[in-house]
Curated annotation (Swiss-Prot):
Pfam families: HpcH_HpaI. The keyword Metal-binding applies. The record marks 87 as: Increases basicity of active site His. It is an enzyme of class 4 (lyase). It comes from Pseudomonas aeruginosa. One of its GO terms (molecular function) is metal ion binding. Its cofactor is Mn(2+); Mg(2+); Co(2+). This is Hydroxypyruvate/pyruvate aldolase. GO terms for cellular component: cytoplasm. Aldolase which can catalyze in vitro the aldolisation reaction between hydroxypyruvate (HPA) or pyruvate (PA) and D-glyceraldehyde (D-GA). The condensation of hydroxypyruvate and D-glyceraldehyde produces (3R,4S,5R)-3,4,5,6-tetrahydroxy-2-oxohexanoate as the major product, 2-dehydro-D-gluconate and 2-dehydro-D-galactonate. The condensation of pyruvate and D-glyceraldehyde produces 2-dehydro-3-deoxy-L-galactonate as the major product and 2-dehydro-3-deoxy-D-gluconate. Also catalyzes the retro-aldol type decarboxylation of oxaloacetate, a general property of known pyruvate aldolases. It catalyses: D-glyceraldehyde + 3-hydroxypyruvate = (3R,4S,5R)-3,4,5,6-tetrahydroxy-2-oxohexanoate; D-glyceraldehyde + 3-hydroxypyruvate = 2-dehydro-D-gluconate; D-glyceraldehyde + 3-hydroxypyruvate = 2-dehydro-D-galactonate; D-glyceraldehyde + pyruvate = 2-dehydro-3-deoxy-L-galactonate. The keyword Metal-binding applies. Its EC number is 4.1.2.-. The active site is at residue 48.
Amino acid sequence: MDLPVNRFKQRLRSGEAQIGLWLGLADPYCAELAANAGFDWLLLDGEHAPNDLRSLLGQLQALAPYPGQPVIRPVQGDTALIKQLLDIGAQTLLVPMVDSAAQAEGLVRAVRYPPAGVRGVGSALARASRWNSVAEYLNHADEQMCLLVQVENLEGLANLDAIAAVEGVDGVFIGPADLSAAMGHRGNPGHPEVQAAIEDAIHRIRTAGKAAGILSADETLARRYLELGCAFVAVGVDTSLLMRSLRELAGRFKGGAPAPSASSSVYG
């Protein structure tokens, strides 16, 4: 059996833009439905959605037959948690709240086997190796790992150039929701000051030769980020899409205008 090729990483290197969807429903059936819609990548959120290791495993299994590539965001950049996520088959991670080059370097080590890193060796127990059915898994697994780091506060912005320069970081994702809050514009990522910071960050990431990514459910902003050269852009969130559709349907039959969404334009 051959090691699965990380097509998300391949396309990042080619410079081809990839369109994604954020998944927070934490359910394999819902994840498969989203995959069937045709997105290039699907973010399985372990930071703000009620996911655990088993629910993420189920979603990875549900997505496996589809071309859309799974990206997992863990709750934090914990080495032991990263080891577990890689063992269940994750090949691309988006790690939140990365503030320094030293932190990014530690994450690079966490996704690699020794001697290049510190990932624990337990491939006989791991879905990633198909329980040691993938030939030469230990010798080639590192090649398919894709590490995305999320910069989303003022410290991270200040250290962005150093973070993007870290070897082994494949892409840098700008987190508009937390960044706007850190800049004093909580809930308003469309504020001109926030947008100026985001556009500058995208330019700096691309200048460093790394892929830039972002999430925005605002179509105008999402298209703007693509024009600026973002390589991976999530353009919606499953919970927001479902909530909006349900409110609209209820409103049509029960009368009255649908209740407005309390979410920022980041999530829809």
